[in-house]
Amino acid sequence: PVEKKWYEKISLRGYTQVRYNRLLETNSLVKCEQCDKSIGENGGIFIRRARLVFSGQVSDNVYFYIQPDFASNAATSGSATGLHFAQIRDAYFDLSLDSLREFRFRIGQSKIPFGYENTQSSQNRLPLDRSDALNSAVPNERDLGVIFYWAPDHVRKLYAKLIHDGLKGTGDYGVVGIGTFNGQTANKAEANNKLH
């Protein structure tokens, strides 16, 4: 068989989540600072997420993943009133150290391996949002940094099977993940010259 060119190994997919919070609302004054801006007064139909994913295994040892979100709130983008700003959620590459990709470094902006719920994709979770405790600890669930993952082949196959069978899965975050991060959350410059 003819080996595929690197650009033939790139895939494109995406998803959108829309919500309306006023249907069962009993108190429009209730707010949630960590949540989306459709909760509370003046909430209506709201595009919670509109994401495209570009990804691919471009060589034996290099995998890339880029995910922009076209439904970001301007409150996290610099303006106080607008909706639906494009913003990078994930932009990283995995550099594998072995042929089975069991040992790898993830370099760039990605999810922080901070608990099971944080590593689950929002398209695979039942609730649209993560718990308030997690949203307070790791806003945006992401940061810029370098993470080392140990992901045995048989465990990665189990994670893939869980998702394929429609069960809750986390994706390919391995068994052990340890890293260093800016500590400022996603799309923010380093603010104190101290890594976390």
Positions of predicted regions on the chain:
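Outer membrane beta-barrel
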Residues: E3-G183, A191-L195
